[in-house]
């Protein structure tokens, strides 16, 4: 039986980050991935040779002078120079269309720039806009982990932990469209404004408002960069393999791990970066309290997406990289609530990008993500990929047609798009091996205690987008927090402050 220092389960950005940090400290690591390819939701797929992203579409945290929090984390991992961010135009990062109001709004980058633009465009709400942004800024300043060197301290509780985003917005402003603009980025973590704490909204949206960027080669850019450096270290990587059983539990520690390929290994500790309910299914129930099991089972999935993937052969505008949202109403809570088994005409994001196909030829891609709900496909939840009944494929066709119709109506530059493929929440569930097919793991509800750090078994840890905060930055931070715990604060602080690490982050 082979022995490792650490096992990391899941090869998304959280798993890759944890494996890299531990290997940088000379630890032997076994990285396990249940799928056939590495990357989790970062991994791309290709249809007709055209690349599309599954779960990574854009991010914040990059800056022109490479001092953003994502720049710094990638610098510490030694891969920042391997990844090329592609910035959306600062003056027009995101266009939001309101069909019911017969208007649209262009959102720039930069929190202070956004603040001044909103005050100019909503003059009667100037004082409320200032109050909102001052409160927003106070949350950011009270959270040291948004700065790389603050990662040696877990975020402390503040009053905004127990106040919803909706409460703060309602307190500050009254214009319905302005309320929607202030809360619109909740679609980037799949939780309604009346459910999420104001603090968590600030932490997720902060970097997205400062700068907005894609990455050359999309999610594969992160995966390829990190896998390349992992292969140079003391890391064994196995695909199509996960943990089947945590065995030989003594003194609240797992001493033997039985893998799905039939082999057995041992390790000092294991870090799970997969969905909390998948972690719970792997751990021995007799060693877990009913309270812990109930807490994990009570987690609700975040909203999902129904996605249309398309291509434009000869775009009229030359194929600019754009992000456009279509919001049918101004009430985000209502739009992000499932009212029927088959919701249509919901909130939607449409991303256009320039890519290269398998032969290296330029292609112009379109990804349209309409908010969906995991219950929408509940009637087919016990069916398998490519073995579903005709009714399911009729549903996919009708919903895809509806999305294309809306794009043609509201986004003229997409009228020449041809549909390449579509995906429902079941597609995401089966492709990503998560329980529900939700877009962002668990719903980030106020007052909820996520599963992060050490679990009831003393050498089992949890990280990932459901642990701390969703998104690339939140998932990476969760792994850094766990690694600090495993390596010790003094060692980890020296690591963060070392010249060799930070020189590549500057």
What are these regions (language model features)?
Residues 315-423:
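C-terminal segments that line or cap access tunnels to active or ligand-binding sites in enzymes
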Residues 100-196:
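Rossmann-like flavin
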Residues 488-506:
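Active-site-proximal substrate-binding core of FAD-dependent oxidoreductases
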Residues 179-189, 409-469:
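A glycine-rich dinucleotide-binding beta-alpha-beta segment and adjacent secondary-structure elements
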Residues 203-254:
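Helical element adjacent to the flavin cofactor pocket in flavoenzyme catalytic cores
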Residues 214, 244-361, 503:
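Mid-domain catalytic core of redox enzymes
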Residues 465-487:
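A conserved FAD-binding loop/helix module that cradles the flavin
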Residues 2-134:
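N-terminal glycine-rich phosphate/pyrophosphate-binding loop and immediately adjacent elements
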